[in-house]
């Protein structure tokens, strides 16, 4: 927030445009189409305090102008680029184009359009909607200082065995039985902050951040599931979350910190009886899926040298 002392009070302000929907299509010389669909939010920290305390809008960048800028900059992108690179591009524009703007915050959620295959062949121009969403946030200061965060929303993971929960606190309110055999399901939200601290330090390789996103997603999923034939036992969501986050930091030195949110989405054993006896006897086979209420587990790991 842009901070001022106004009328004897501390005053913080910023303004922007949220939920700007934009899609961009590219066609290669070989005839292949590519598409991205983004939901963009812009927020500017600027010297426009007079618009709040006086009848003076002369320092305001109109939010409608911010919306139009999203489309104009998308039009200028002649080459396919990552969601992170587009966020940085927008933020750089705002801090350089407007002398009043001291910092820009751009956050984007990418809709997961995936190329389809027909008869075993990738389709040149056909796409289907996937599930998890790629997110990015770029905070760029007038000085060129950068904070870049990537993330995943809605990564649904489930394993039907190799999970348990034992040894927890028991008291007069506890009804949950201990178990060493249960289903484990979650919907991962992940945020990781890169260690790049300026616009001049980010990699210039095309689609670098898209590739990194796919690699981080794979590491998180692989450590949730374990090896394909034997899996890995999870004594709690907490332990699994920690091991997933630790694996990401160990694998990617360019990541300074990572935060994971992993709700424990319950699949309840089904036992149904009447006066004549069992109708359904649970034998690790029939469950009642329920997403409310659910356990809420989250944690973050950061490197000791990280200033974040």
UniProtKB/Swiss-Prot annotation:
Its EC number is 1.7.3.3. CDD domains: Uricase (cd00445). The active site is at 17 (charge relay system), 63 (charge relay system), 266 (charge relay system). The keyword Oxidoreductase applies. A motif (Microbody targeting signal) lies at residues 306-308. GO terms for molecular function: urate oxidase activity. Keywords: Nodulation, Oxidoreductase, Peroxisome, Purine metabolism. Its main location: other. Pfam families: Uricase (PF01014). GO terms for biological process: nodulation; purine nucleobase catabolic process; urate catabolic process. The keyword Glycoprotein does not apply. It is an enzyme of class 1 (oxidoreductase). GO terms for cellular component: peroxisome. Pathway: Purine metabolism; urate degradation; (S)-allantoin from urate: step 1/3. Urate binds at residues 63-64, 165, 182, 237-238, 264. It catalyses: urate + O2 + H2O = 5-hydroxyisourate + H2O2. It is found in: Peroxisome. InterPro entries: Uricase (IPR002042), Uricase_CS (IPR019842). Belongs to the uricase family. Catalyzes the oxidation of uric acid to 5-hydroxyisourate, which is further processed to form (S)-allantoin. This is Uricase-2 isozyme 1. It comes from Canavalia lineata (Beach bean). The lineage of its organism: Eukaryota, Viridiplantae, Streptophyta, Embryophyta, Tracheophyta.
